[in-house]
From Swiss-Prot:
Source species of the chain: Thermodesulfovibrio yellowstonii (strain ATCC 51303 / DSM 11347 / YP87)
The organism's taxonomic lineage, starting at the top: Bacteria, Pseudomonadati, Nitrospirota, Thermodesulfovibrionia, Thermodesulfovibrionales
Keywords per UniProt: DNA damage, DNA recombination, DNA repair
Coiled coil: none
InterPro entries: ARFGAP/RecO (IPR037278), DNA_rep/recomb_RecO_N (IPR022572), NA-bd_OB-fold (IPR012340), RecO (IPR003717), RecO_C (IPR042242)
Protein's name according to its UniProt entry: DNA repair protein RecO
Amino acid sequence: MHYSTEAIVLKNIPYGEADLIVTYLTKNYGLLNLFAKSPRKIKSRFGSSLEPLTYSQISFIGKEDNLQKIIQSDIIHPFQTIRENYRLFLQIANALRFLIQALPKKEPNSELFYLLLNTLLYLEKRIKPDNYILFLKVRGLSILGYLPDFKNCGVCRQELKEEFYYSSGFIICKKCSSSYHYSSSALPIPISQGVIKLLKEISTWTLNFLERVKISDKLFNEMEKFLQNHIFTVLGYNKTWDTEKNITAS
């Protein structure tokens, strides 16, 4: 079978002496791992089209239940300036990691595809990039169904008011935070009203609005810590990640 789709490279892994396994988020087929023959050779026909974050039109062949093979990759937009900004590249790589782990393979998700593509386009402008990375994480969690309910307690389901706590993937009320026995790894952590308010507001924002948003350093750091804890809880991976090893090409 022959397939064609728009795709964004999320990561690549060396395979053998000159080959690669490339992980894509595609417009039509969702998350795919594809085999690329000899792209690491100097005269490879793929050129730089398999570099992380590259947006391309790709063609591939093979049966769906096997490792399919890339036969053509034409760059639409390279996003090279993002790769060349080391700090920004690390930030986007961290966000991509949870997408790779959370998204089921070969399940189309055009909403997530366009979220990533449009976020990368805005990130190239270098206007408040932290806002766009935060937006990508929150919206990505929401699209994938991993964003916690911030309106009702995850235990008693009562409306959340005044004081908020986080435990085991849920936002809970003050009463439930003290009336249940929690394991040492799931002890309720206080969450500020500012974080809850920001979660609610982000759900209504658009990408072109983000460059006008001012988030205080204190609130931004609180939000990042909350998201880091939540992603660690629901996906179960270490908070530290060797970005060089997991997303960049050799």
